[in-house]
Swiss-Prot record:
Keyword Chloroplast: no
Protein name as annotated: Uncharacterized protein YfdI
Gene expressing this chain: yfdI
Keywords: Cell membrane, Membrane, Transmembrane, Transmembrane helix
GO (cellular component) term, any one: plasma membrane
TM regions (residue ranges): 7-29, 68-87, 94-111, 121-143, 150-164, 179-201, 206-225, 358-375, 382-399, 409-431
């Protein structure tokens, strides 16, 4: 295939994806402030009428004014400082376009690490697979200011770095791992996951790899330790809207210090409901104000008292009612993704219909399979991505319980999609390899 034609087709595909997704975005559920507070005035929450064109502050606050330490926030800050030289506005559509271009390239990097795209059939195979990875549930993140979007770009790059064996890949590994692990508290286990792969399956240059993983882990711990503002809410939800509620619903004996009347009520007095997500009450913030002393260790008491919970929790009725890529916030009628409905929205709906209740168990199967696979490329990819996805389930639940679990499980959903993508690419690679071997034998 002529290189100019190949590049033209690739650019055309990227532009089609960007055009289809330009009006698909995410609701601000009061979390945008963590990333944009020093840069622009507060973006209205719970409104579907955002302009996506935001005026920058006349004087951008210093970078140390962030209360929530996140690699995403610092990347956004750097971007805004640069564009402020030329404009007074942050255009979320333009920013999301750049991010989509990088995301598609990360998928292309994984694909070409197995299969060369010198023929039309292989290039269009990539287009089909990449298109399926561009659902509204994924691309809508780029028009928001949620830290989770870091995973969309840097998890594929992390996978690519694991499958290459050169100094450049080691540098890519470091930056990808550092950015993911410091993007949000719930990604803290990522360095340990990568390190466990190296310990058990790939000890080549283990000292360098160990240093990388330790540095990233320490950076993540630092980010968590110096972040402010949301910890008390998370601890309350992890217990009274999480572990205690699970124990109550399953007939387990709760600790004597638990206030039964507050179990199942979030910090604003919304009562958990499987059918509706939640229902309003007149309690308000009374329960939260009375139990600000809760700890994450209290939430983990569930695992200590009932170890079988680690196997049962993913199949809990309350949890399964949250398995939905068309995310909702607390109330099931309050959809997080909004905008133009098109084929990208259809992909999200199809994924929900087919994979709704099997994503977790599928990730577990991917993980088990990775242990026995001989090919080191696919082994590394599936081991790390599946274990990352599994970890996201437990960190999300024990980090904030059932509250907003639908969106908090984004990392698990995307990991499942990426495992499928990698597996299909690998199977196509094996088919091509077998056909080439048969052709060589005939000649």
């Amino acid at each position: 295939m002529n290189k100019a034609i190949k590049v033209s087709l690739y650019i055309s595909f990227v532009l089609i994806i960007c055009a289809l997704s330009k009006n698909i975005m995410m609701l601000n559920t009061s979390d945008f402030g963590r990333a944009i507070k020093p840069l622009i005035e507060d973006i209205p929450a719970f409104t579907y009428d955002l302009p996506l064109l935001y005026k920058l502050k006349g004087h951008i606050d210093s970078i140390d004014s962030y209360e929530y330490i996140s690699s995403y926030s610092y990347i956004l800050y750097t971007y805004v400082l640069f564009i402020s030289i030329f404009t007074e506005y942050l255009d979320a559509r333009v920013l999301s376009l750049f991010l989509k271009v990088i995301y598609i390239y990360s998928l292309y990097a994984i694909f070409t690490s197995y299969i060369k795209t010198e023929r039309y059939v292989t290039l269009f195979t990539f287009f089909i697979l990449a298109f399926l990875m561009c659902s509204s549930s994924t691309l809508s993140m780029f028009a928001s200011f949620y830290q989770e979007q870091i995973v969309i770009i840097f998890l594929p790059f992390l996978v690519y770095s694991l499958t290459c064996k050169n100094n450049k890949s080691m540098l890519l590994l470091f930056f990808s791992l550092l950015i993911i692990s410091t993007a949000k508290n719930q990604f803290i286990l990522t360095p340990l996951i990568v390190y466990s792969y190296y310990i058990f399956f790939d000890r080549h240059k283990l000292i360098i790899k160990s240093v990388i993983c330790v540095v990233c882990l320490l950076a993540s711990i630092f980010a968590i330790s110096y972040s402010k503002g949301v910890v008390e809410l998370n601890k309350y939800h992890a217990t009274y809207f999480g572990s205690y509620l699970y124990m109550k619903n399953n007939g387990y004996k709760m600790p004597s210090y638990v206030d039964d009347k507050c179990v199942g009520l979030d910090a604003w007095g919304n009562k958990f409901d499987i059918s509706f997500g939640a229902t309003p009450t007149e309690v308000g913030t009374e329960c939260f104000e009375s139990h600000k002393d809760e700890t994450f260790s209290n939430a983990l008491f569930l695992l200590v008292s009932k170890p079988s919970t680690i196997f049962k929790l993913p199949f809990d009725d309350g949890v399964m009612s949250q398995y939905k890529e068309n995310y909702f916030h607390v109330y099931k009628k309050l959809h997080v993704i909004y905008g133009e409905s098109n084929i990208l929205t259809t992909i999200t709906n199809i994924k929900d219909n087919i994979f709704k209740n099997i994503r977790f168990i599928s990730l577990l199967l991917f993980f088990i399979a990775s242990i026995f696979i001989r090919n080191n490329k696919i082994k590394a990819s599936l081991f790390v991505v599946s274990l990352f996805g599994i970890s996201q389930f437990y960190v999300s639940f024990f980090g904030e319980g059932y509250r907003d679990l639908s969106k908090h499980l984004f990392g698990m959903y995307f990991s499942f999609d990426l495992c499928l993508y990698i597996t299909v690419v690998f199977l196509i690679y094996k088919i091509i390899q077998r056909n080439q071997d048969n052709s060589d034998v005939k000649h």
